């Protein structure tokens, strides 16, 4: 199956998208620029402009690829799933639970049945470790060691979108960093 991923937003989203790409490649799927069977949009919702960019991209992808399975994940999908549902997407994933999102995408591609899996409560106490990867087309490798926030600043939506703060255990973070360093 051919796929393409699109990322809007922060470094955490970039890291999570790279992990999804690596997982799809490991399963034997092919990354492509066009004629894709599967399209994934990892979204941001930190501003109204970000929300508009999400909607614009999702609409364009649906219009240009009416037969592709379109999956949307990330903060916009988590907080504004009703808006995302209205955009004719096939799979909506929640923040955290990327493995379930990937399985739902592949199921939707096989069965042509839409799936919505948004966890409004975001009560995941554990850190979701995603596979660390090499540099790919980048000059620096990324390693996600923390997600979420508990500060609830009046101006910030991140605690609502990503849930409470969770961290990768220190020993595991060190081991992953050493592995990335050994890979160059």
Set out the residue ranges of the language-model regions.
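Proteins enriched for Cys/Gly/acidic motifs involved in redox and nucleic-acid/cofactor modification
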Residues: 1-184
């Amino acid at each position: 199956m051919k796929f393409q991923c699109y990322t809007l937003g922060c470094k955490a989203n970039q890291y999570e998208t790279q992990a999804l790409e690596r997982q799809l490649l490991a399963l034997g799927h092919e990354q492509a620029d066009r004629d894709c069977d599967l399209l994934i949009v990892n979204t941001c919702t930190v501003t109204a402009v970000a929300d508009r960019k999400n909607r614009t991209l999702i609409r364009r992808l649906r219009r240009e690829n009416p037969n592709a399975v379109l999956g949307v994940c990330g903060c916009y999908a988590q907080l504004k799933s009703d808006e995302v549902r209205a955009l004719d997407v096939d799979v909506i994933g929640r923040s955290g639970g990327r493995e379930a999102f990937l399985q739902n995408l592949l199921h939707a591609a096989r069965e042509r049945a839409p799936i919505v899996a948004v966890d409004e409560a975001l009560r995941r106490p554990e850190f979701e470790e995603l596979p660390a990867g090499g540099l790919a087309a980048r000059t620096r490798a990324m390693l996600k060691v923390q997600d979420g926030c508990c500060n609830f600043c009046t101006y910030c939506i991140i605690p609502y979108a990503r849930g409470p703060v969770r961290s990768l255990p220190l020993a595991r973070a060190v081991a992953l960093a050493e592995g990335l360093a050994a890979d160059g």
